[in-house]
Amino acid sequence: MLKNINPTHTQAWKDLTAHYEDAQDLQLSDLFANDSERFNKFSATFGSDILLDYSKNLITEETLTKLFALAEQTELKAAIAEMFSGEKINKTEDRAVLHSALRNRSNTPVVVDGEDVMPKVNAVLEKMKAFTARIVDGDWKGYTGQEITDVVNVGIGGSDLGPYMVSEALVPYKTRLNMHFVSNVDGTHIAETLKDLNPETTLFLIASKTFTTQETMTNAHSARDWFLATAQDQAHVAKHFAALSTNVGSVSEFGIDTDNMFEFWDWVGGRYSLCSAIGLSICLSIGFDNFVELLDGAHEMDQHFAQAPLEENLPVILALIGIWYNNFHGAESEAILPYDQYLHRFAAYFQQGNMESNGKCVDRGGNPVDYQTGPIIWGEPGTNGQHAFYQLIHQGTKLIPCDFIAPSISHNPLTDHHPKLMANFFAQTEALAFGKTKEQVEAEFVAAGKTLDEVKDLVPFKVFDGNRPTNSILIKQVTPKVLGSLMALYEQKIFTQGVIWNIFSFDQWGVELGKQLANQILPELNDADSIAGHDSSTNGLINAYKQWRK
């Protein structure tokens, strides 16, 4: 069981607090000027495909030593071992946390409640493989005998964001199938998705563990209604719907053949589920062999995380640097900035992964925390972000540590597009780190033929303070295997931070209250009667809605 250790009570935390008093004045320009080996000392590779450069951070070797001590004193190593061994570290739900078992390519036993789960994991993978082959090869026919051309994944949260992110990231590996993802209960989402589809050639994947998720089942019933408006026979549903669920009764009642139900288990958290049956849409999108490559990459990073010394452990290094900014520098957010258009949903995926996992205010002892936990995660692809929010990162008043991610090899090497993209990738971290001094700005004006008197009022606006921290993650190319490793890198970073912050990262009770209130309000919207049972604001909003919808 995870220990209940308040990190602020450790000697390492006290040492870091004292160290920050000296380190807050660190200048990246000085750190690089004083150490020609800084890049070599503060960078690491993973295999031959991933390079992590963390040299442009406001850290010294002393900083890292104290951060590693914090990891030791909060018993991170023991926590890692407990997670991988199947201990029920999700205490509030009495569950193990074993998304690592889903991609356990070594096939070594993983025991939960006395049972090795790997035979079940492998059985579902084999079932996914066979199903994928039938659909992709065209052997599976719809009710009119035509091949499936379009697949619609109906889910929300972890049943949508992960598969959608991966399917978009790996479009270069696309099968002949067209993938669509519906998540929002707003009817516009499914209506627009179905507008151009043919019921005779469309397959729906209904992704809901319980088969009761409000948004997913609302969309599922609308999808079935749309299908039956053409098919006219409930029996045809079985050829056009599959379920990613564990609720056999509800799946069968819906009309889905339970042979086409793909199970997963309570030790698979939603936001960590894309390597489970929830990844069936990924299999159909990129082919089963490429899905296995994704699992391989994730497994290799899992093994690295479980076995590497803390000082060489990439997820741990990223996590500790994040804690340095979050808890000592007072940074409130982190930006994830992929310089690859295929990764356009990567930041959104880990926005969910991080904020739902570590957005907690109660520690493992049930007490309110008196320190900062999870940061706000956000980001967009480069170079779009440069023309949107980089102004604030460069010259704003907030400290925003950034992760820059880019591939050396593009899947679309059109003329000089990729060199221009990469030039921006390299330039941004250099600009953020070193900025531009008043003297440099003045020299540029003089070189352009201006006098200092002419530009003296403009100069302050063109100065860049620099000293803005970044990590650079350079990958060889966005492949299934590399994406799997990158995904696991961030997952295990999140886990590491949760351990150190003494919180439970694998529940999400914060989403429940809104659901409960929505279920109470829904019946109140069925008539035109005025509502008075809530606070004045909610009453006023509901009553205005009722008036306007007439």
Curated annotation (Swiss-Prot):
InterPro entries: G6P_Isomerase, G6P_Isomerase_C, Phosphoglucose_isomerase_CS, SIS_dom_sf, SIS_PGI_1, SIS_PGI_2. Belongs to the GPI family. One of its GO terms (cellular component) is cytosol. This is Glucose-6-phosphate isomerase. Catalyzes the reversible isomerization of glucose-6-phosphate to fructose-6-phosphate. Its EC number is 5.3.1.9. It catalyses: alpha-D-glucose 6-phosphate = beta-D-fructose 6-phosphate. GO terms for biological process: gluconeogenesis; glucose 6-phosphate metabolic process; glycolytic process. It comes from Photobacterium profundum (strain SS9). Pathway: Carbohydrate biosynthesis; gluconeogenesis; Carbohydrate degradation; glycolysis; D-glyceraldehyde 3-phosphate and glycerone phosphate from D-glucose: step 2/4. Keywords: Cytoplasm, Gluconeogenesis, Glycolysis, Isomerase. It is found in: Cytoplasm. The active site is at E356 (proton donor), H387, K515. It comes from the Bacteria. GO terms for molecular function: carbohydrate derivative binding; glucose-6-phosphate isomerase activity; monosaccharide binding. Its main location: cytoplasm. Gene3D superfamilies: 1.10.1390.10, Glucose-6-phosphate isomerase like protein, domain 1 (3.40.50.10490). PANTHER family: GLUCOSE-6-PHOSPHATE ISOMERASE (PTHR11469:SF1).
